[in-house]
Amino acid sequence: MSEFFNCWTKKRIDLIDWQEKIIRDIFGTLKPNGYRQFNTAYIEIPKKQGKSELAAGVALLLLCGDGEERTEVYGCAADRNQAKIVFDVAVDMVRFCPALSKRVKILESQKKLIYKPTNSFYQVLSADVANKHGFNTHGVIFDELHTQPNRKLYDVMTQGSGDARMQPLYFLITTAGNDTNSICYEIHQKALDIDKGRKIDPTFYSVIYGADEGDDWTSPKVWKKANPSLGITVGIDKVKSACESAKQN
């Protein structure tokens, strides 16, 4: 999938540069056997950057793009309504794409998409799934990881659930949180440790968008660093206005 669909204007738009890089990195970095190198991807990004569109695109790539039979892709979040946000964007992408709409069956009442050529599905899970086991997971889209009340759902969906698949992907995407006891903070710290060379895990991919300690928050360069879609999904005038207001406080 080389493009996303703008669900508000119903016009096709190109991937934003940062979105394209993430897609290329995750799906284009392969092991010698031809399967994906990365099993876990952690993306931390502020609101209004195109997070849901990216997550929906990844879900559809996992559903339709790998050519594997009977793949199971799940949408998870702190509650079903949150997980439904990404699903709804994916539904719009399917409806506005003739190639997908011919091949994907939409079951809105079940929050489920079925890719008919391989009998694969993408489904939103309910909150009580943390008490269940037995998933044969090809992909998990974990939205707003920082809102998880504990690590139970994360563990159920990532520990052993994809062992029978050749290239499972756990795609974790979230805005920043502040609970240092959460699973999100644990994954965030792992991402920093790998980035700084303190840990090594070739199966783990991460991108964190945000200002570092000591950055000048009044600098447009820092605004762009923390908001990769600045000027596209986020108007620069709004950021300027917010900055000026903050200076007065």
Question: What do the PLM-derived regions correspond to, one by one?
Answer:
Residues 1-249:
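Phosphate/NTP-binding elements of NTP-utilizing enzymes
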